[in-house]
């Protein structure tokens, strides 16, 4: 008695189901294209998800939304010879590719399998096939940038927001971007409030050339002295 196992030659993982459907048409029967539906893991909203005392070690957790789609990916990965990570060519896309690879590795599904990272900037047959033909490694600098962004989001937002709610009733939240932006806006508003207008005049001369064209010029030197912005504080100084 023989047992025949169906083998998917190549598994391609993208972010969105719409892209998966289109790319599947371009690649044909030797490929199965599945969507991760965005990020598959995140930092749980609890203390200790990022540990600054342990080189900012981060604890990742699969959310309930992603479990269904991860099961489809893991089931397909078991039957695949090659796994192609084709998420978006940006910081977040690189992070998703890294998370998928790490997750499959933790599940011990990468043994004896080839895993590749491919990117394409448009969803056309030419761009997709060119990307498939030119795989590369996961860009660790982009992954590191994502981790720094996510760790700061957690450390600033998760830890400081509750303090704001306690100390400043009515406060919404703190954040990696919004808190800095609010600081800049506040400082600028203070500068505007403290601004005292100062009168100054500039000296311009118009010349007419032989053709009758008017040429406007700013006088920058008068009596061998450079004219500064506040050299003429009122009309009488000119």
Region roles according to the model:
Residues 200-238:
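Compact Cys/His-rich, Zn2+-coordinating modules
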Residues 11-13, 84-86, 117, 176, ...:
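Structured core elements
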Residues 27, 79, 158, 197, ...:
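Short flexible coil/turn linkers enriched for glycine and charged/polar residues
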Residues 123-207:
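C-terminal or mid-to-C-terminal helical accessory/interaction module adjacent to the motor/catalytic core
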Residues 109-111, 157-166, 182, 210-225:
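Short acidic (Asp/Glu) and glycine-rich catalytic loops that position anionic groups and cofactors
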Residues 14-15, 35-37, 87, 156, ...:
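Flexible glycine-/small-residue-rich
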Residues 4-150, 164, 220, 225-236:
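Intrinsically disordered, low-complexity regulatory segments
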